[in-house]
């Protein structure tokens, strides 16, 4: 998922896509131009070019007018980025947890006690006037007073998924 600072890169990528595939330079990309571009890139293999163009057009051309608008391309890119984040959320959350436990789990029991959790809480930049006990209760799903690796993993995963569903800017 992109942040506001990344939007200029996304904008540039979309502009480059339009420039690359807009063969007649009319500032729109048609399904025919996509096919012609793919045909060239696929060394004249019309079947592969047709299939690839068909998939792309059916996926990106939301209003089925045979053209790719800037909105359609950017929506497609944003949707793909969200899907990628969702697919990687579990793995990334596990990596986050492993790194966190290596750093904060002083007694190496693969869970954070209250002291360890408060340190994590402060490192995350939470408001110092917030109640770490309250946050601990939210993350501590089994209510045993500790935050286990699996509870941390679920929390990190949910944060990543929420980020993926949020607005680009």
From Swiss-Prot:
Superkingdom of source: Eukaryota
Q: What is one term from the GO cellular component aspect held by the record?
A: extracellular matrix
- Pfam families on file: EF-hand_7
| Keywords annotated in UniProt | Calcium, Metal-binding, Repeat
> Where Ca(2+) 2 is bound, by residue?
140, 142, 144, 146, 151
Query: What residue stretches are annotated with the EF-hand domain?
Result: 9-44, 60-83, 92-127, 133-162
Stored PANTHER family: CALCIUM-BINDING PROTEIN (PTHR10827:SF85), RETICULOCALBIN (PTHR10827)
Q: What is this protein called?
A: Calcium-binding protein G
Q: What does UniProt list as this organism's lineage? A: Eukaryota, Amoebozoa, Evosea, Eumycetozoa, Dictyostelia
